[in-house]
């Protein structure tokens, strides 16, 4: 994998960044495009060679296994690829950096238990933190500029974050923070200011003393990725966060993490992504598609596109199936089907969030056969008032959103759509949907082209 990964991505996705797809791409049945996307996503294959971390010095007895795991990964990579096997037991480790052609495989009852010491997450690495590029702590499992990489098996990744470690950096009392303790806010504001002013990446250095939490899994500028079968718990921040990646499969994972910003799976400026048969139980959005934040996201200019999500289950979280708020590079061609969402602690089922600083286009988004039990606020929320709200010069373009055979048993609102007068939400279609036990009328601020076909709310047909 050469160092011109971004050039490759920009060349391959210029149509997504610079303009909408031609109408000919979208057939009468848009779901044929979803089938075409799935057909071309190919999980990586690996030679049948195993590299057991025990043979490289790892011990499931509390011994630090960081170096042993790194030696096994290097040997596997040097041999041309294979599986680095984590056998049964609990293995203490600092961040793990994957290399090309390596499948890190956790057998059932294997646990990777990650260090709580921030110093172990140095040296600084390239990352995107809340949609802005910088140099910061490594993710717990990290890769940059690699291809043919995987994280598989029935084992568990334990992030070891709690209200005494990592989560207090959020700066909220319900996350263990108290007045007088440091938190992320000064560094977060500084990073966003650097992004707005085009400060060179090499000068955007954070890490020690800045309190910007790492993610659990972050693969950057890489391709041909598989994450399958594993369970993830208690991440410092996002659980799965591919950034500027292509040909990504996330399958059969289980995520349980109720800390701040512990999103389940957040593809950021990624293309050709399949997420299926996963279970999300989180402290933030279960699944959020992103594409960079504000000016920095527009500078990078790579959309998230050609994403299929199916057969997933969402429990607790702020949003079940979410796009944004970091979406300045654009999000398009998203297909969601046969998913279940249900929890009194799930706020929004289908959630879009942006504002007048983000800009960006969200278009060609399709939901079908989505079953929602109980949700706290709204079945469909499109919110232009998120965070900065109207305090900015940009005009988000959000439209061409379609719901078919979506049902809900209980929610405060069916629709909560808040656009801008200068940039209305447009072209939203609901077909054959049933929403029961809805408590309040729809909120429709600056919406154009809303069409409801055979939609029932509390047993009554709505037009």
Question: Positions of the model-derived regions?
Answer:
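Extracellular/periplasmic carbohydrate-active domains that bind, remodel
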Residues: 2-463
């Amino acid at each position: 994998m050469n160092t011109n990964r971004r050039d490759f991505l920009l060349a391959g996705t210029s149509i997504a960044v610079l303009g909408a797809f031609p109408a000919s791409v979208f057939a009468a049945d848009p779901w044929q495009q979803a089938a075409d996307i799935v057909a071309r996503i190919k999980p990586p294959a690996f030679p049948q060679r195993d590299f057991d971390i025990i043979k490289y010095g790892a011990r499931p007895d509390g011994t630090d296994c960081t170096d042993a795991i790194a030696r096994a990964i290097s040997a596997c990579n040097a041999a041309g690829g294979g599986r680095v096997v984590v056998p049964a037991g609990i293995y203490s480790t600092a961040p793990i950096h994957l290399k090309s052609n390596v499948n890190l495989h956790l057998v059932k009852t294997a646990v990777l238990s990650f260090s709580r010491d921030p110093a172990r997450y140095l040296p600084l690495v390239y990352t995107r933190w809340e949609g802005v590029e910088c140099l910061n702590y490594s993710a717990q499992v990290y890769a940059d500029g690699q291809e043919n990489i995987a994280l598989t098996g029935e084992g568990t990744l334990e992030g070891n974050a709690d209200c005494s470690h990592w989560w207090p950096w959020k700066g909220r009392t319900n996350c263990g923070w108290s007045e007088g303790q440091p938190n992320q806010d000064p560094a977060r504001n500084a990073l966003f200011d650097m992004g707005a002013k085009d400060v060179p990446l090499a000068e955007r250095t954070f890490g020690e003393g800045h309190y910007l939490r790492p993610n659990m899994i972050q693969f950057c500028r890489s391709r041909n990725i598989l994450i399958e079968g594993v369970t993830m718990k208690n991440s410092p921040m996002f659980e799965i966060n591919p950034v500027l990646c292509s040909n990504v499969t996330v399958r059969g994972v289980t995520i349980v993490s109720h800390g701040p910003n512990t999103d389940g799976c957040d593809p950021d400026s990624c293309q050709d992504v399949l997420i299926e048969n996963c279970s999300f139980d989180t402290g933030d959005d279960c699944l959020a598609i992103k594409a960079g934040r504000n000016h920095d996201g527009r500078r990078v200019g790579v959309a998230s596109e050609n994403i299929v999500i199916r057969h997933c289950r969402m429990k607790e979280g702020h949003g079940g199936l979410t796009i944004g708020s970091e979406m300045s590079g654009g999000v398009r061609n998203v297909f969601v089907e046969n998913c279940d969402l249900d929890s009194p602690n799930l706020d929004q089922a289908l959630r879009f969030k942006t504002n007048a600083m983000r800009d960006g286009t969200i278009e060609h988004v399709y939901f079908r056969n989505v079953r929602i039990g109980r949700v706290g606020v709204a079945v469909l929320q499109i919110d232009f008032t998120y965070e900065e709200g109207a305090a900015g010069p940009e005009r988000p373009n959000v439209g061409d959103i379609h719901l078919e055979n979506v049902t809900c048993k209980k929610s405060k609102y069916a629709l909560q759509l808040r656009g801008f007068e200068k940039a209305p939400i447009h072209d939203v279609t609901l077909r054959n949907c049933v929403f029961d036990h809805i408590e309040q009328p729809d909120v429709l601020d600056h919406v154009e082209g809303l069409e409801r076909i055979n939609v029932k709310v509390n047993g009554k047909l709505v037009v």
